[in-house]
Each structure stands twice: as structure tokens, then as C-alpha cells.
Amino acid sequence: MATIQSETDCYDIIEVLGKGTFGEVAKGWRRSTGEMVAIKILKNDAYRSRIIKNELKLLRCVRGLDPDEAHVIRFLEFFHDALKFYLVFELLEQNLFEFQKENNFAPLPARHIRTVTLQVLRALARLKELAIIHADLKPENIMLVDQTRCPFRVKVIDFGSASIFSEVRYVKEPYIQSRFYRAPEILLGLPFCEKVDVWSLGCVMAELHLGWPLYPGNNEYDQVRYICETQGLPKPHLLHAARKAHHFFKRNPHPDATNPWQLKSSADYLAETKVRPLERRKYMLKSLDQIETVNGGGAVNRLSFPDREALAEHADLKSMVELIKRMLTWESHERISPSAALRHPFVSMQQLRSAHEATRYYQLSLRGCRLSLQVDGKPPPPVIANAEDGPPYYRLAEEEETAGLGGVTGSGSFFREDKAPGMQRAIDQLDDLSLQEARRGLWSDTRADMVSDMLAPLKVATTSHRVPDSGPEPILAFYGSRLTGRHKARKAPAGSKSDSNFSNLIRLSQASPEDAGSCRGSGWEEGEGHTTSTEPSAIPQREGDGPSIKDRPMDAERSGPELFDPSGCPGEWLNEPEWTLEGIRGSRAQGLPARHPHPHGPPRTTSFLQHVGGHH
């Protein structure tokens, strides 16, 4: 076990936590206090010396903040020797990427995404007060503090790429931000400000919900292409001012076009750069609104009678997507600021409280935010933001102290009838998705007792009140590991293509497929996932769609209609002489009155007609 020593303290190196481009991070024991710390170790050379000087300058600026209230990592000290630089920080548990990896990149529920977003926005608001741009916000740089004691309490780390705004605003082409989270103004070469971090946070929020990066471009062209295909082209005045516009766009040859610019095709980019564009997205979205429909987000629209918990979660997801749309805008001046985002209904929970206060989902969401903001030895700060106040700080809901997780207050709240807003809009979004996949289930956090009761009503409603699906569900555009980088094209499941021959339809008065000699196991017989055509059916069959009567055996012979034989009936009344053919003819020949079905003789209408006919 190695030991390193500064002027004031001594550290025992326990293990190496990770290695990166510029150095490694080790876990150490601080002898003076007995606490575990994280030590960032870099080689002592001229290049890394410039990086260290920049990070130290930013860390000294951030040192004036309360790291717990500002949600930034606590910096302890810096020292060096002839070979290496050492930066000592508080030890945190793991970053969001590692947390996603442990959970197989399962989608994170909206209420946990809000808990993370709230804290990162508070950090960005504090950094803005110091005129600091973090410039490298991503899941790897958002650390979970202690997931067991304080679920989803996070802090922002790594100020190695951070900059003072006044020092970088005039840099022509700064190479900042990881590509997946790089703002359009950096990609296009436009003036930028601290709102580049807001774009990155919007991408992180979408990634936590999707379980996959929203825009995982292999290069800057792919990055711009992904954004254009989901959000449309930037406005012409942006491209006119962008220094790098010609790298990704070209002039529109049609003079009457509404936009004088158009995105270069993949073939154009390949011809110019000899670099083949790649498709690395998991979901090919036609708009940011379609984020709402991914990973079970549209399930409530397929319930005939969704319960209150499902409605609350669905409304929360819609509110989250609205905030993401405000964060991911082409123009930075239209992008929401950190302080304004803290007052957004999704973060402040005002909309959730007003419409779904009586639900357990709201109570769990409120408690999750309070736990994430609570600092040891201090009372938890209020969560719900005052929308009328300018500063991004908070006031507590009046009923918060009386509303516990075991029960909720408010007598009339349970009897309000809520309706899922915008159901038809969500259905239309589902129909617009270009690719689809079976829905992945939501997963709970490490404290399963906090979410099991909330998810149970949704499962019951989903199984007991199901109506026909409103539209297709999204699938993987590419399927592979985020770590290995190997991507495999996923085959389209049954039901994703239409049957152009309509051979799976059975017309009335025609024989069924087995009568025509089809083999056992056909789609018509099994009822789900198979058809008699070589292509799958356009309408996926669900449980209960097949015939409810037991199928006729395959070897049964179809016969024509049989004549009725009255002699086979067990009763004797049909064999009486009056009902035989000879008896009927004989009764007519003898002029006997016809038998009437009425027990008391012919009806009065018949007697009247016979009377009138006798006079004529």
C-alpha cells in the first residue's frame, strides 16, 4: 500500500478507482481525520500542468460555496512532487453512468430524474453567479453521494474543462463538452454562454429516461444530423452567422425554398471527408415529444380506466418532456436558464401537487426531493419553488408536514375525477414513430419499499382495464453494448411490417387455411405472432383475439348442408297423418280448413277478409 504526503497531511492509497485520459483516481485514507478521500493523480508535465492550473483556479472560485447546498464536490487540498500532481476531494459513491450500467441501462422513473435535475440545476445556478461554465456536464460527471442513505443525492464533479465566462466568450472554436452533450452553438461555431450546460443537462435527462444517449453521434456531422432529424433545421439566420455551417449544411438549390440551407446528405459527407456516417441511436424520434411515448410512457393512454397513480405518473412525464424541450433549443437565447428551470412545474412540482396531491406518487416524489436536499445536522430545505419569485429558491408546501407516506390529508381530494390530458396527442406521437420495440419495464431504486406501492396500482390497472393498443411502440434502431461499441442491427419483430398479400385474412364463405392444406402451426391456428404469409401481420394479435370456441380437428371433413329428416326426431307428433305429405294433400282435396297456429281459431283479420270476399 503506497503512501503519499503533503505539507499538512498523509494519505494511504487503498485502491485505484479508475483511469482516464489525463490520469487516474485513487481511493485513499486521510490519516489526520480518518476519512476516506478521492485523490486525482496526474503526471507532472507541461501539458497537464496547464490543465491543473485551470482546474485549480476554478476550484478556488468554487471553494467559496457550500458544497452540500451548491451540490458541487468538496475540494480538500492540492500538492505535487517531482513526478505527479495530486488533487484531494471528498469520496463519493459512483457516477450516474456507473449506476446505469449496474442496472443494465434501465430507464429511470421521472420522479427520480426530477430529484437529480433539481440538484444539478441548483449547482448550475450557483456556478452562474460565479460566471463559471462547467462545459463538461454528462452522467460520468454527476456523482451519487450515498445511494443507501440519501437516494439520488448528487454532486457535480470535474472542473478540468470549466472556464470563466469572460475568458472564453471570445474563443472562436473552443473544443469543449463531450460530443453527445455538445450544444448546437459549439457545434456550429456560434457565440455561447453558460446555457451550454443547460443543453447538456437536457440530454442527460433524456438519456436517463431512454436508457441510451439521445444524440450519440460518432462525429460532429452525425451529431448535427441527429439533432436536425428530431428537432428540424436551425433557422436561417443562425446558419448565416455560424462559422462552421458549411461543414454540415449546403445552400438549397431551389430559389423558392423556405429555408435557403439544407443538411448535407450522408453521401455528400462521405464524398467530402471519406468518413462514413453511422447510425448509433436507439430511438429514432421525429420530435422531442415522442420521448413521452418511450419505455411505457404511453401506457396510460391504452387504459380504459387508468387509476390515479398512473395518471399522476403520466402527467409528471409529460411535464418532464416539456422541460426537456425548453432545454434543447437551437438558439441559446430561447433556451431556459437554470434559475427559470428551477421554477418550471416539473421541478417545482406545483402542477403535480395541484392535480395529484392525494396520490402516493406525489408523496414519494416530494420525499425523494427532500431526502436529496437534506444535509446531516441541518433541517431539509423546502422543495416547492415559488413561481412568482425571481430567485431560484424554494418555499415549503403548507401541507407538507402533515402529509406523510402512510396517508395523505384532504378529504375531497380522493373524489376528484382526473382525466389524462392530451391522450390523443400522445397517440398521434406513437403513430409517427418510425421504429418500434417491445416496451421495457420501469425499474425501482435501491430502496424498493419506496416505489413498490406506487407501481402496484399501475400494474393492476394495466392488466384489468386494457383496451386495444392505440399505436405502435418504439424499438431499437441499433442494439448493442454501450461499452464495447459493437452494434448489431435488430430484426423487426412480428407485427412491424404490413402483409401486402392479405393472405392472413379469411373471407366469409371460403375455406380456412387448414382446409386448403396448410400445415399445423400456422398463424391462423396459433393466433399470435405468426401468419400464413412470409411477412408478419400489420396488426399484432393480442391475447384474446383468437376464436373463443374450440378449434375443429384438422382431419375433419367439411360436408355440404344436410336435408332435415323428421323421422329421426324422437317425438311422435311429426309422424301423425296430418303432417305427412299425403295428409296435407288430402286435407286440401277435402276442403278442410287449414290448421292455424292460434289455439282459439284464426285471427280476426282473417275472418274479416273471408267475410268481405264472400260478398264479392
Curated annotation (Swiss-Prot):
Residues 542-560 have a biased composition (Basic and acidic residues). The active site is at D136 (proton acceptor). Residues 11-347 form the Protein kinase domain. PROSITE patterns: PROTEIN_KINASE_ATP, PROTEIN_KINASE_DOM, PROTEIN_KINASE_ST. Its EC number is 2.7.11.1. SUPFAM superfamilies: Protein kinase-like (PK-like). Residues 497-512 have a biased composition (Polar residues). It is found in: Cytoplasm. It holds the Pfam family Pkinase. The modification Phosphoserine is found at S512. This is Homeodomain-interacting protein kinase 4. Keywords: ATP-binding, Cytoplasm, Kinase, Nucleotide-binding, Phosphoprotein, Serine/threonine-protein kinase, Transferase. GO terms for biological process: regulation of signal transduction by p53 class mediator. It is an enzyme of class 2 (transferase). Belongs to the protein kinase superfamily. CMGC Ser/Thr protein kinase family. HIPK subfamily. Its main location: cytoplasm. PANTHER family: DUAL SPECIFICITY PROTEIN KINASE, HOMEODOMAIN-INTERACTING PROTEIN KINASE 4. The keyword Kinase applies. Autophosphorylated. SMART domains: S_TKc. Protein kinase that phosphorylates TP53, and thus induces TP53 repression of BIRC5 promoter. May act as a corepressor of transcription factors (Potential). It comes from Rattus norvegicus. One of its GO terms (cellular component) is cytoplasm. It catalyses: L-seryl-[protein] + ATP = O-phospho-L-seryl-[protein] + ADP + H(+); L-threonyl-[protein] + ATP = O-phospho-L-threonyl-[protein] + ADP + H(+). It comes from the Eukaryota.
